[in-house]
Amino acid sequence: MSVMFDPQAAIYPFPPKPTPLNDDEKQFYREKIKRLLKERNAVMVAHYYTDPEIQQLAEETGGCISDSLEMARFGAKHAASTLLVAGVRFMGETAKILSPAKTILMPTLAAECSLDLGCPIDEFSAFCDAHPDRTVVVYANTSAAVKARADWVVTSSIAVELIEHLDSLGEKIIWAPDRHLGNYVQKQTGADVLCWQGACIVHDEFKTQALTRLKKIYPDAALLVHPESPQSIVEMADAVGSTSQLIKAAKTLPHRQLIVATDRGIFYKMQQAVPEKELLEAPTAGEGATCRSCAHCPWMAMNGLKAIAEGLEQGGAAHEIQVDAALREGALLPLNRMLDFATTLRA
């Protein structure tokens, strides 16, 4: 008897935390990375959720700090022949799909994502086959194989608009892998959405009880929430959006204190945007509960200075992203559909 994969029941082992570096070691690796970037004709692209010192280095070396899609876009347009992707593995894959001629290096290929892990291709493909009348929309936080099985790829920044568009065409949707984001777009659009039941281990930990207590301590604070969070958290929010949208909301909201319900890595760029405001972490533990991620992705934390230097210096199978040519072609189609759709939204 076969047992259907249950993303909600899956427990993913966390990687060990990187060994802390002292100030001299940090300076040594910073200088080494700067030298290696020049020698390899490389540029560094980092996600908002990496540690502040990694984002700072990306800025100092002319790189990019953004969400996964903009990271890949930046890399595709940049003249560098090599991209150093500080993030998790699917981000490196997306960069390779959009820039096949470039060398894509990562500090470690073991930097996973619970959304990616929670959507294995064989089980997901069978799920799609069981609902052949539905259009398959997958979040960017998926493997190249899952993207290749989809009709559309989407980021949180345009998810609502895309589902509205598909709903206007009378299409029924399979959404994967994040159930919270899928439920959010369904409620925003009223579309017929069948959700795969994955979740982000960071956002899934935000707790309403603890958040309510924090709001009592800071009654004048606005709450900014990423839509990968549970519905009960989203319903408390003053602003809901992707990483880039939350940074914009921090600038436009009049509140002097902001409670932020997403990975705390975003605080680096958000504080730059609003230096006069106080940023507060939304709690990830409730009554009698403890947190596993504690508002920081453990795989993002693998992108340390030493690992980045090793990735640039060593390259090879331990650090270079490869995507099968057939998979790349399959994944490029839904990615390009998304890019074209995003362009029409800006027009």
UniProtKB/Swiss-Prot annotation:
GO CC terms, sorted: cytosol
Q: Which UniProt keywords apply?
A: 4Fe-4S, Cytoplasm, Iron, Iron-sulfur, Metal-binding, Pyridine nucleotide biosynthesis, Transferase
Name one molecular function that GO assigns to this entry.
metal ion binding
Q: What class of enzyme is it?
A: transferase
Which pathway is recorded for this entry? Answer: Cofactor biosynthesis; NAD(+) biosynthesis; quinolinate from iminoaspartate: step 1/1
Q: EC number(s) of the enzyme?
A: 2.5.1.72
Reported cofactor(s): [4Fe-4S] cluster
> Binding residues for iminosuccinate, per the UniProt record?
47, 68, 139-141, 156, 226-228, 243
User: What are its GO biological-process terms?
Assistant: 'de novo' NAD biosynthetic process from L-aspartate
Q: So what does this thing catalyse?
A: iminosuccinate + dihydroxyacetone phosphate = quinolinate + phosphate + 2 H2O + H(+)
A Pfam family in this protein? NadA
Q: Entry's NCBIfam families?
A: nadA, PRK09375.1-1, PRK09375.1-2
Please give the family membership noted in the entry. Answer: Belongs to the quinolinate synthase family. Type 1 subfamily.
This protein is called: Quinolinate synthase
Origin species? Salmonella agona (strain SL483)
Q: Tell me the classification of the organism that encodes this protein.
A: Bacteria, Pseudomonadati, Pseudomonadota, Gammaproteobacteria, Enterobacterales
Q: Which gene encodes it?
A: nadA
